[in-house]
Curated annotation (Swiss-Prot):
GO molecular function, one term: histone binding
Assembly behavior: Can form homomeric and heteromeric protein complexes with NRP2. Binds histones H2A and H2B and associates with chromatin in vivo.
InterPro entries for this protein: NAP-like_sf, NAP_family
Coiled-coil regions listed in the entry: 23-64
A single cellular component GO annotation: nucleus
Stated name of the protein: NAP1-related protein 1
Species, as recorded: Arabidopsis thaliana
Assigned protein family: Belongs to the nucleosome assembly protein (NAP) family.
C-alpha cells in the first residue's frame, strides 16, 4: 500500500510539472503574439506621425503669406507686441522696467518651424534702431537632435557702449529712498542659450513654448486683454453688489 501511494504521488507530481510546462508555453506564446500586435501598432503610429508631419508641412506653407499679411497690419499698430507681451499672464512678469524700455523698439515677432517641422524651430524678435544694441534682430533656435536632445543657439547681443543686460531696477521704498533690487532681465533668455546644463534652462524652454504655442498663434487675444479684464471686473462688481443687496434683504427679513 505504501509503495502504491508513493507511486501515485510521483505520477501526480509529474502531471503537475507537465501542466506547468504547458502553462509556461502558452504564456510565452501569448506574449509573443502580444509583441507582434504591438509591433503592428508601432508601424501604424510611425506612419501616422509621418503623415501628420506632411500635413503640417503643407499648412505651414499655406500659413506663411497669411502670417506675413498679419505682420504688415501689426506694424501699423504702435507698441502691439510689447502690449501683447505685457498682457500675457505668464510672459508679462518676465520683463523688468528696463526690459520694457527696450521692448518699445520691438516692431515684429516671428516663429518659424524647420522645413521638415520635426527638426526644430526658431523665434526671432525684430527691433527698430535703438539706443541699446546694434542688432536689428535677435533669434533663438531650437534644434531637435536624433538622440533626443535639443541644441539651443541664440544671437549674441551686441550691446552699445555703456549698455548691457539690465540687472536691476530702482524701486522706491517707504522712506522715499531708491534701492536696487536684482531682477533677471528677459534678455538673459538669449545669453544663457549656450548653458544647457544650467538649472534655468527648463524655464527658458517653457518661455519658448509659450511664445510659440500661445502668443504667436493669436497675439490679438493678449493685445485686447486689458479691455476684456475691465469688462470682466465690471461684471464681478455687479455680481458683488447683487450679493450684498440679497444679504441686506435677508438680514431685514430676519429682524422682522
Amino acid at each position: 500500500m505504501v509503495a502504491d501511494k508513493s507511486k501515485k504521488s510521483k505520477i501526480e507530481e509529474k502531471g503537475e510539472e507537465e501542466n506547468l510546462e504547458q502553462i509556461d508555453a502558452e504564456l510565452v506564446l501569448s506574449i509573443e503574439k502580444l509583441q507582434e500586435i504591438q509591433d503592428d501598432l508601432e508601424k501604424i503610429n510611425e506612419k501616422a506621425s509621418d503623415e501628420v508631419l506632411e500635413v503640417e508641412q503643407k499648412y505651414n506653407v499655406i500659413r506663411k503669406p497669411v502670417y506675413d499679411k498679419r505682420n504688415e497690419v501689426i506694424q501699423s499698430i504702435p507698441g502691439f507686441w510689447m502690449t501683447a507681451f505685457l498682457s500675457h499672464p505668464a510672459l508679462g512678469d518676465l520683463l523688468t522696467e528696463e526690459d520694457q524700455k527696450i521692448f518699445k523698439y520691438l516692431n515684429s515677432l516671428e516663429v518659424e518651424d524647420a522645413k521638415d517641422v520635426k527638426s526644430g524651430y526658431s523665434i526671432t524678435f525684430h527691433f527698430t534702431s535703438n539706443p541699446f544694441f546694434e542688432d536689428a534682430k535677435l533669434t533663438k533656435t531650437f534644434t531637435f537632435l536624433e538622440e533626443g536632445t535639443t541644441k539651443i543657439t541664440a544671437t549674441p547681443i551686441k550691446w552699445k557702449e555703456g549698455k548691457g543686460l539690465p540687472n536691476g531696477v530702482n524701486h522706491d521704498d517707504k522712506k522715499g529712498n531708491k534701492r536696487a533690487l536684482p531682477e533677471e532681465s528677459f534678455f538673459t533668455w538669449f545669453t544663457d542659450a549656450q548653458h544647457k546644463e544650467d538649472a534655468g534652462d527648463e524655464i527658458h524652454d517653457e518661455v519658448a513654448d509659450i511664445i510659440k504655442e500661445d502668443l504667436w498663434s493669436n497675439p490679438l487675444t493678449y493685445f485686447n486683454n486689458d479691455a476684456d479684464e475691465e469688462d470682466f471686473d465690471g461684471d464681478d462688481d455687479g455680481d458683488e453688489e447683487g450679493e450684498e443687496d440679497d444679504d441686506d434683504e435677508e438680514e431685514e427679513d430676519g429682524e422682522e
